[in-house]
């Protein structure tokens, strides 16, 4: 299946998330992207799902928002990096809002909420949208993979987390089946320029590498 999108591929420096306009490279074109026509496993389906939600018009909006539960989402044209992951998984019938909430409710002390944010109970509106919580959840419920600087070690459907802006800002994205001109696996993420496909795997400090599929 072929989809046509208005694709922005950015090579950004870490300051973009702090509203810097500095770009090392920008490619802006009408680009044809091939989905995997007959995905053979969950992770190929996840890559297709990530590609399907690319939208450069999504505004990076880190505000706290009250949402329904389960299957709650912030307005479609807004979001942050974690919402890319949440939306892609939801296309495959997995509600990370519900999954993360239930695991946190049963294992609250294993999550960084108390230490990091001073929270003493779960919050269905925001817990699943916080990258540190997703890192704990994916490590507990999925598979933790090696962190390397070799792009070939990052496979279709993998989840990668980074620290940006001097290790101050956690970030997350989905590895796709699409390769850049350099042969690097491209990432669907939102670092401030919408839900975009970008050759950015090694742009920042990688701190997490996971696979996750709901085995229930």
Question: Would you name each region that the model predicts?
Answer:
Residues 1-7:
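Sec-dependent signal peptide recognition
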Residues 21-49:
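Post-signal peptide N-terminal segment of mature Sec-exported envelope proteins
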Residues 42-47, 105-187:
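...with weaker cross-activation on analogous glycine-rich loops/strands in unrelated enzymes
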């Amino acid at each position: 299946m072929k989809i046509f999108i208005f694709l922005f591929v950015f090579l950004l420096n870490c300051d973009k998330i702090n509203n810097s306009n500095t770009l090392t490279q920008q490619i802006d074109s009408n680009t044809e992207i091939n989905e995997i026509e007959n995905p053979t496993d969950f992770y190929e389906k996840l890559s297709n799902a990530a590609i399907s939600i690319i939208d450069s018009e999504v505004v990076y909006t880190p505000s706290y928002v009250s949402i329904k539960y389960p299957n709650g989402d912030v307005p479609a044209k807004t979001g942050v990096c974690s919402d890319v992951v949440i939306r892609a998984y939801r296309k495959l019938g997995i509600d990370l809002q519900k999954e993360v909430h239930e695991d946190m409710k049963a294992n609250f002390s294993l999550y960084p909420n108390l230490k990091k944010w001073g929270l003493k109970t779960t919050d269905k509106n925001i817990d699943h949208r916080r990258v540190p919580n997703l890192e704990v959840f994916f490590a507990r419920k999925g598979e933790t993979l090696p962190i390397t600087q070799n792009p070939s070690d990052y496979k279709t459907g993998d989840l990668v987390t980074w620290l940006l802006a001097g290790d101050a800002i956690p970030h997350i994205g989905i590895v796709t089946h699409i390769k850049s001109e350099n042969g690097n696996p491209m990432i669907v993420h939102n670092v401030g320029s919408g839900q975009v496909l970008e050759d950015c795997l090694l742009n920042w400090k990688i701190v997490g590498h996971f696979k996750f599929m709901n085995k229930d």
